[in-house]
């Protein structure tokens, strides 16, 4: 099979075709079943986190080590030349690219990953999150988890709850699932944090069903995937936040009418939008979802850095 991902920048989930997504998911499953500890031996990968991260950074680093590659970089953007000495992002990337085979970047500025790709001397860039814009590798692990639990990525009813305006994970996930046939979307959020129009317009253009709902109870019996996200306190005034906090919290009692196959996902961190008692239900899948990040990131790293795969 031709590997069209070889040397490709992974900036946005929209840059990947459906067949490329399927290639990554198949490779993820293979690596989960059969580890390949020397697949990226002698490769050096830079991990450049200009913004704080725990799960994404550690997941990437674990994936790199388990493939036999080496890693260099930083996890605190405040202590590098760009901040201390006023060096530009583009100069930083240009220099780092001369040391390594690929660069992973997280940056608070939207569009920063695509800008970095213009100055990386053709070394592949992996976007680990650029502001409220995109988070493609999170989407890959989300798709992998959905496929594992539902045995398909088509004909799914997906509810997405929480901060749909600023949540980069929900934008990427909706765009990715829109590439697969006959999926339906249910959006549940405060009015101030509803899904951006460009996402809704994209679904309309593709004639994909979507609808806004006021609470989780309305749709719990209809859905296959419940994708929860946290509502950030700083996004709302105190009254709106208090209302949202009570209205958009998932409690175990709400799950009594859920389908047997339904699974709850969350990009984490979870604050108080999922009660702890939900953790003990068969629907809770967010910690297994996080663990799948290693395999999805191993898959995309190896496909981009190695042309031929068995």
UniProtKB/Swiss-Prot annotation:
Residues that coordinate or bind L-aspartate: 85, 168, 230
Pathway given in the UniProt record: Pyrimidine metabolism; UMP biosynthesis via de novo pathway; (S)-dihydroorotate from bicarbonate: step 2/3
Coiled coil: none
Molecular functions (GO terms): amino acid binding; aspartate carbamoyltransferase activity
Keywords: Pyrimidine biosynthesis, Transferase
PROSITE patterns linked to this entry: CARBAMOYLTRANSFERASE (PS00097)
Gene Ontology biological-process entries: 'de novo' pyrimidine nucleobase biosynthetic process; 'de novo' UMP biosynthetic process; amino acid metabolic process
Transmembrane segments: none
One Pfam family cited in the UniProt record for this chain: OTCace_N
Binding of carbamoyl phosphate, residues: 55-56, 106, 135, 138, 268-269
Enzyme Commission identifier(s): 2.1.3.2
Entries under Gene3D superfamilies matching the protein: Aspartate/ornithine carbamoyltransferase
Reaction(s) catalysed (UniProt annotation): carbamoyl phosphate + L-aspartate = N-carbamoyl-L-aspartate + phosphate + H(+)
GO cellular component: cytosol
Family membership noted in the UniProt record: Belongs to the aspartate/ornithine carbamoyltransferase superfamily. ATCase family.
Self-association and partners: Heterododecamer (2C3:3R2) of six catalytic PyrB chains organized as two trimers (C3), and six regulatory PyrI chains organized as three dimers (R2).
Role of this protein: Catalyzes the condensation of carbamoyl phosphate and aspartate to form carbamoyl aspartate and inorganic phosphate, the committed step in the de novo pyrimidine nucleotide biosynthesis pathway.
Name of the protein this chain belongs to: Aspartate carbamoyltransferase catalytic subunit
């Amino acid at each position: 099979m031709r590997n069209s991902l070889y040397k490709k920048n992974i900036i946005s989930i929209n840059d990947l075709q459906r067949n490329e997504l399927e290639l990554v998911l198949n490779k993820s499953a293979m690596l989960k079943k059969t580890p390949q500890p020397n697949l990226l031996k002698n490769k050096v990968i830079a991990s450049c986190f200009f913004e704080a991260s725990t799960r994404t950074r550690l997941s990437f680093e674990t994936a790199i080590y388990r493939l036999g590659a080496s890693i260099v970089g930083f996890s605190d953007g405040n202590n590098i030349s760009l901040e201390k000495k006023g060096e530009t992002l583009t100069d930083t990337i240009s220099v780092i690219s001369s040391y390594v085979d690929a660069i992973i970047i997280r940056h608070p500025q939207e569009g920063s990953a695509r800008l970095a790709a213009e100055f990386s001397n053709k070394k592949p860039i992996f976007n680990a999150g650029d502001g409220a814009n995109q988070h493609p590798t999170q989407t890959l692990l989300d798709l992998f988890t959905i496929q594992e639990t539902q045995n398909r990525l088509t004909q799914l009813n997906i509810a997405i709850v929480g901060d749909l305006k600023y949540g980069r994970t929900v934008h990427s996930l909706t765009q990715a699932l829109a590439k697969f046939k006959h999926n339906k979307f249910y959006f549940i959020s405060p009015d101030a944090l509803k899904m951006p129009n460009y996402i809704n317009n994209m679904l309309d253009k593709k004639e994909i069903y979507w609808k806004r709902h006021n609470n989780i109870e309305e749709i719990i019996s209809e859905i296959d995937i419940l994708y929860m996200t946290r509502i950030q306190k700083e996004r709302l005034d105190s009254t709106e936040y208090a209302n949202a906090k009570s209205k958009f919290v998932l409690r175990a009692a709400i799950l009594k009418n859920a389908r047997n196959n339904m699974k709850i996902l969350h990009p984490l961190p979870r604050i108080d939008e999922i009660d702890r008692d939900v953790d003990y239900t068969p629907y809770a899948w967010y910690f297994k979802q996080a663990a799948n990040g290693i395999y999805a990131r191993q898959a995309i790293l190896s496909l981009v850095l190695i042309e031929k795969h068995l």
